[in-house]
Amino acid sequence: MESNGVPMITLSSGIRMPALGMGTAETMVKGTEREKLAFLKAIEVGYRHFDTAAAYQSEECLGEAIAEALQLGLIKSRDELFITSKLWCADAHADLVLPALQNSLRNLKLDYLDLYLIHHPVSLKPGKFVNEIPKDHILPMDYKSVWAAMEECQTLGFTRAIGVCNFSCKKLQELMAAAKIPPVVNQVEMSPTLHQKNLREYCKANNIMITAHSVLGAICAPWGSNAVMDSKVLHQIAVARGKSVAQVSMRWVYQQGASLVVKSFNEGRMKENLKIFDWELTAENMEKISEIPQSRTSSADFLLSPTGPFKTEEEFWDEKD
């Protein structure tokens, strides 16, 4: 347990990761002083794990916040932090992986990442990040060569560990068939309204840590949902336990053996989100949550194409498997 009360999880590679991280996706203040100050405040109140990505366009502000936190003495060294970033799909080609990671390091003003993840199980034609992806740019990913390049990034010391995001059991099997270094993390949507039971069991059997995103329904994202925050079941449990709905949702994820990333720029909620580790949901609480109707919030529509590797959401998520 760290001094901020956040437990440390030992990944299969042996490195330790804070169980709770601050997400940096879909902020409304990208690249602004406010965004940097929010990251700085998060460090001040106790966050030590930050989850970013090339596609989030938040790496530079996070890097500035880390540098300022060091200058202010909020942290004594970069080693106190756990920094995750992600490989964007347009760079998911064997010869572009290392340059993409090095670009993320330049943005972050860091010498190494703690964790580097493949953002999606699909590639795009090489080029700059764009919000509207042309359908003819969507390509199948060569898991073997892209993962080998990820392994090289770890071997060279530019990242301490490697993993994936949004991979189904089937896609993990394909990737691991050619892997020399197995992925240590699979970051996916997981919440009381999307339990991911089969995927959790598969990842546990293969020593892959699930990191949950959209734990509160990604309500600030264009595809977000109020299903978690408006859940009557979660509200009833929260009132009975003297907690917030957000805390109940986050605690449920943690009690499933998963780590999680959440995002808030509100100092009060930042502090509240850290307070989920000194209490437990009861067996009765867990039983009620198990009965909540299930639905996916995140959409892969922007990566679907009649000529691409995945034509439907079902194919992308392998939900019929």
UniProtKB/Swiss-Prot annotation:
In yeast (Saccharomyces cerevisiae) engineered to produce opiate alkaloids, the expression of COR proteins leads to the accumulation of neopine and neomorphine as major products. The active site is at Y56, H119. Changing W223A: Reduced oxidase and reductase activities. Strongly reduced reductase activity. GO terms for molecular function: codeinone reductase (NADPH) activity; oxidoreductase activity. It comes from the Eukaryota. Keywords: Alkaloid metabolism, Cytoplasm, NADP, Oxidoreductase. Disruption phenotype: Plants silenced for all codeinone reductase proteins accumulate the precursor alkaloid (S)-reticuline at the expense of morphine, codeine, oripavine and thebaine. Its EC number is 1.1.1.247. One of its GO terms (biological process) is codeine metabolic process. It catalyses: codeine + NADP(+) = codeinone + NADPH + H(+); neopine + NADP(+) = neopinone + NADPH + H(+); morphine + NADP(+) = morphinone + NADPH + H(+); neomorphine + NADP(+) = neomorphinone + NADPH + H(+). Latex secreting cells (laticifer cells). Expressed constitutively in all organs with highest levels in capsules. Restricted to the parietal region of sieve elements adjacent or proximal to laticifers in roots, stems, leaves and carpels. NADPH binds at T27, D51, Q187, S214, L216, S264, R269. It is found in: Cytoplasm, Cytosol. The record marks K86 as: Lowers pKa of active site Tyr. SUPFAM superfamilies: NAD(P)-linked oxidoreductase (SSF51430). Optimum temperature is 28 degrees Celsius for reduction (forward reaction) and 30 degrees Celsius for reduction (reverse reaction). NADPH-dependent codeinone reductase involved in biosynthesis of morphinan-type benzylisoquinoline and opiate alkaloids natural products. Reduces codeinone to codeine in the penultimate step in morphine biosynthesis. Can use morphinone, hydrocodone and hydromorphone as substrate during reductive reaction with NADPH as cofactor, and morphine and dihydrocodeine as substrate during oxidative reaction with NADP as cofactor. Converts morphinone to morphine, and neomorphinone to neomorphine. PANTHER family: ALDO/KETO REDUCTASE (PTHR11732). This is NADPH-dependent codeinone reductase 1-3.
